[in-house]
Regions:
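Glycine/proline-enriched, intrinsically flexible loops and inter-domain linkers
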Residues: 1-250
Length: 250
């Protein structure tokens, strides 16, 4: 509690970005930071710190991957203005073809302002905010579960790694914190793995469970802001970064 009796909560999230970092160490690690920060401020919490826990191999390629991953983590955190307060790094030959990149973030939020990733009322609106949708990260979630063949990184694999825009993320962060403080929304969800498709399904699923209802949602793909012409199926599963789905009243 604060001096005036206001109750606060700490938000903590941690996730891995292993395969993307192996394929493209700079963007893979940077987007890992971006994703974990969005997990924090979609709850209405302001991120106050980042930590990273790294495991890399000992061969020449692994050292190059490590150096670029650290640069990506540092760049994204510095641009957004959230300090990296610690972590650890170890090397071992067992990580030569499978580095481990775990990123953790901490945030703080007033208890009364916590936002959950759900839709609770009929006729609520799903509002898309943030970056335009592109072909970045198509099949990224599936790629993260695959095994590399002969340790080769193909152009197709590289296209599965998302591109980062930390300056846009900073704008999203501030907007979401303001939304939280003013209690303007019913729910909010980051568009992470699986993109718009998974984000909308998760929002509806949680809403159904909380309200014991059979609610669903309609998505108008022709209204989604896109960078260029895209197939509707790709719009649904794109993992372009810095995008959110907000649940609000009209």
């Amino acid at each position: 509690k604060s001096a005036n009796g206001e109750e606060y909560c700490i938000a903590i999230r941690i996730e891995s970005h292993n395969h993307p970092t192996y394929i493209n160490p700079y963007e893979g690690a940077a987007t890992g930071v971006g994703g974990i920060l969005r997990d924090i401020f979609t709850m209405g919490a302001r991120p106050i710190a980042i930590m990273d826990f790294l495991r890399f191999g000992v061969d020449e390629k692994s050292i190059e991957l490590l150096n670029n991953a650290v640069k990506g983590i540092s760049y994204y955190g510095n641009c957004v203005g959230v300090p990296n307060i610690g972590g650890d790094c170890k090397v071992d030959k067992s990580f030569n073809t499978n580095p481990l990149v775990n990123v953790c973030s901490l945030g703080i939020v007033k208890k009364k302002n916590i936002i959950y990733g759900n839709a609770l009322t009929c006729k609520s609106l799903l509002v898309y905010v943030g970056s335009k949708t592109g072909n970045e990260g198509i099949n990224g979630a599936a790629m993260a579960s695959n095994t590399f063949v002969d340790d080769k990184v193909t152009d197709e694999l590289k296209s599965n790694v998302q591109k980062s825009d930390p300056f846009l993320e900073k704008l999203l962060l501030e907007a979401c914190c303001e939304i939280s403080e003013k209690q303007l929304v019913e729910g909010m969800q980051d568009m992470g793995a699986g993109g718009l498709l998974c984000a909308s399904l998760e929002i509806v699923k949680r809403g159904r469970e909380k309200t014991n209802s059979d609610m669903g949602c309609e998505i108008y793909l022709e209204k989604i802001p896109i960078k260029y012409e895209m197939e509707y199926s790709n719009i649904l599963i794109s993992e372009s970064q810095e995008r959110m789905l907000i649940v609000c009243q009209e």
